[in-house]
Amino acid sequence: ATGYNEKYLPLLTEAVSAGHQIALHSASHEYSDIYRSSDAYWEDIALLKERIAPYVDAESIRYLRFPGGSTNTVSRRYGGKGLMKQLKAEVEQKGWHWVDWNVCAEDAVGGHPSAGTIYRNVVHETGQQTNCIVLMHDSATTRTTAEALPDIIRWYADNGYTFLTVAEALPLN
């Protein structure tokens, strides 16, 4: 949510230069605002693109992750039962991909888990899966995620996993 991280926006340029992929998420991450309607969601994405445009080619970004994921139920509270289905269809109509995770670090569930707990959560949730998209958070309340990351990367590498960008793993048609 860029609204909370304005001072870090210049790091986007560095991330792209290092070969990382930028995907869209949300400008505000306020469920009650963004999931009011389809128009409200796309207004939030437009604001996000406006904020990141000085640092990356925002118009070329074709991947996004819905706040709460594509099957979230919180959106029903604000925009009705069919909103997520509508938004997913609209993303696809634009020729974009929406991306969900299949491994959750559980680093934002509250209680400030330790780096060791986050590591164990990722290893446990990975199980026997061969293709993983791991959900992790980078915020003031999830500082231990960064501490856990080197061990998580090492574990995946030691277990034969290859690291790809989302675009490499899920190419657009």
Regions found by a protein language model. Give the residues of each.
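Active-site beta->alpha N-cap acidic-glycine motif
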Residues: 1-66, 169-172
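Glycine-/small-residue-rich active-site loops that bind phosphorylated ligands and cofactors
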Residues: 3-4, 71, 141
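Residues within well-ordered alpha-helices
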Residues: 11, 86-87, 152
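Alpha-helical scaffold elements within enzyme catalytic domains, especially in hydrolases
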Residues: 14, 90, 154-155
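Structural recognition of the beta-strand scaffold that forms the well-ordered cores
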Residues: 21-26, 60-66, 97-102, 132-136, ...
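Alpha-helical scaffold elements lining the catalytic groove of polysaccharide deacetylases
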Residues: 30-56, 72-131, 144-147
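C-terminal domain-boundary segment and adjacent tail
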Residues: 141-173
